[in-house]
Amino acid sequence: IRTNGEGAYGSDPLWLEREPTRQEVIDAIESANPPSYSEIVFCGYGEPTERLDDLVAIAQYLKAKYPSLPIRVNTNGLSDLIAGEPTAQFFKGVIDTISISLNASTSEAYCEMCRPRFGLKSYEAMLSFTSQVRDFVPEVVMSIVATSDTPETEIAACRDICDRLGVSLRVRTY
């Protein structure tokens, strides 16, 4: 998706020339008239939990000002490894939905596809985070991208993982 254009699925451009400050993010959201949207989503061509403190502070601001506006985070689920500590509890009360990129049914396939900087332990860390965050976020979803070449057995294996974790699976077609 990153190589196909500036944005994805009709979004504004997702590439940034620099990291905006927390206040710049809030100002940009405010200038877009948040009540006119059905949801605020933290996502992009980077990992939003790389700036977990900012993400949580911005979400707290939005929740206080627009309590009925749902907030979602799309994540790779590696925030515990990024932060070096458990992070699921930080989402409590400020995030309504978290979508975690499962991407594959095995750690080997996951690492081949995603090339995480933390290596093979990334897959188990992502599954562990998913299990933990269920206690703090009302809706937890895992996602995979399926093409016409994706075997049904792979989709079924991913669905089994989600069933074991007690979360939903979203299959995105590409």
Predicted regions and their residues:
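N-terminal pre-triad scaffold of radical SAM enzymes
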Residues: 1-6, 39-42, 96
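Canonical Radical SAM [4Fe-4S] cluster-binding loop centered on the CxxxCxxC motif
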Residues: 1-21
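A near-ubiquitous, low-amplitude feature marking generic local secondary-structure context
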Residues: 8-12, 38, 45, 93, ...
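Surface-exposed cleft-lining segments at the edges of enzyme active sites
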Residues: 12-15, 41-48, 112-118
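Short Fe-S-cluster ligation motifs
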Residues: 17-45
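Conserved AdoMet/S-adenosylmethionine-binding subsite of the radical SAM
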Residues: 27-30, 49-174
